Amino acid sequence: TSPLEKSTRYVVFEKGKYYRPAAIMNSKFADEYVQMCDELFVAYSSKVEPMKAFVREKWPIAAFDLGGKKFNEMTDEAELKRAKTAYESSVRARALDILRYYLPAATVTNIGITANGRAFEYLMMKLMSDELEEVRTIGQLMHQELSKVIPSLVKRAAPSSYISETKKTMRAFAAAKLSAVRIRKQPTVTLARYDKDAEINVVAAALYQFSHHPLSQLRKIVKKMTAEEKMKVVDEYMGKRTSRRERPLRAAETAYYQFDVLSDYGAYRDLQRHRVMTQIPQLLTVEHGYDVPPEI
């Protein structure tokens, strides 16, 4: 799948656009929930212009760099105009990046997804099997719409008892096993596990694509290479890229690293949208504390 989501960096979110779960709205916490979300949105929207002014003061346009040239070094009118437009865009983006900490996790957003029928089928199965009501509803609505255009490809999409039951039983098991264990403090980013043969794997895979040798033989050859020889292969394979948009070829994906990341929700959403990775998230919590940007 290829998803695209409304950005908290470039779009000011409207007041009142947050989810109201039936379980909360039918409980004694309904008024408190609505009041809290409304107050967060009021704080967010009321500070957009003041925060933009703060950003302009802290990062003035005179030091703004466009194409390697500072604003106060520019003389061409067209260049100055482009720089002013780019500067104001960066001011707005930085201000909204800071203020997104006010947005509750219940903030609703727009997501567009491009995928083939099989990917949609699996996605809907996961959505319709989720513990959250709003996620299940999205899965059902997606199924209704896709059934109009690719009915034969999504007709088997249905809730999975395996997914729902596994989540339920694993949550109960984890609670029983770990509830008495105190949560240990840790750094925000921890390299939990890494591939000790990463260099060998990448170099062997890089050579594999351009040879007819079996991988096992190439691994033995690479193990006998000097560090300089292996680095030469890596440089030839990846070193000619001119920008981050030119992704390395697939051999680079044969090395694996496992990180445990403790972050605020906004930072996680940025991470969630990018990179080739397998993500295993935990539920949102304040067990580890919370972040407040110094600018706020």
What are these regions (language model features)?
Residues 1-296:
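A conserved ligand/cofactor-binding region detector
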